[in-house]
Amino acid sequence: MERNLLLKIQYDGSAYHGWQVQENARSVQGVFQEALKQVLHTQPDIKACSRTDTGVHAREFCLSMKLSHNIPPERLLGALNHFLPPDIAVLSCEEVPLDFHARYSCCGKRYVYEIWNNPIRSPFLHGRALHYYHHIDENKLNEAAQHFLGAHDFTSFCTLDNRDMGDFTRTVTESSVTREGDMVRFTVAADGFLYNMVRIMTGTLLAVQQGRFVPEDIPKIIEGKNRKLAGPTAPACGLYLEKVFYEPQV
């Protein structure tokens, strides 16, 4: 009897060339599929909630797969964690309806971009946060971040490629910049994201910090629908997929 399983995993993306399998490159999906093969002796078709790029991390990454194997979800979880490397972990495994799809059933995601704001770098955060030397005024950046809220055409905040053809409108439901000690976090949630959208948003907020823009420039950048108007693309190391939303969670 066919079953559909939802697995939630997390990973440190530092050592991987993103989620998706690539020829001659180590990917999270490739390593995960090898662990699945060790456990099930077969290769299920994995449906992922998203595709993270090289060096991007995930605190919650969801995938679904249909199985005819009768292994209980809790046993599959334990067996996968046995075969997976220390920088990937399965958090949960549960049966879901057959029509559930990790990507197409998703109604939103939350990302967090982490910035270590201290003149001295932290060796423990290398590859896990952006190191920014000069003091960040989180209140000014939070003011700028409020302008991302709502439904907008985010053409100015994406890298164009064949993954993003068509509608560039996304609805941002959460956008804030906060500080906890020396760690500054940009948190943003939306019904969907364009390619490099969060990293370009972050780069633009840092450009506000540097005086290239003022918070009130953000609406003009959005309205311009031109990538050249926004700030640079922030490095991948500070980006985390924080949460994936499915009904009725949102």
Regions found by a protein language model. Name each.
Residues 1-250:
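Structured-RNA-binding interfaces characteristic of tRNA pseudouridine synthases
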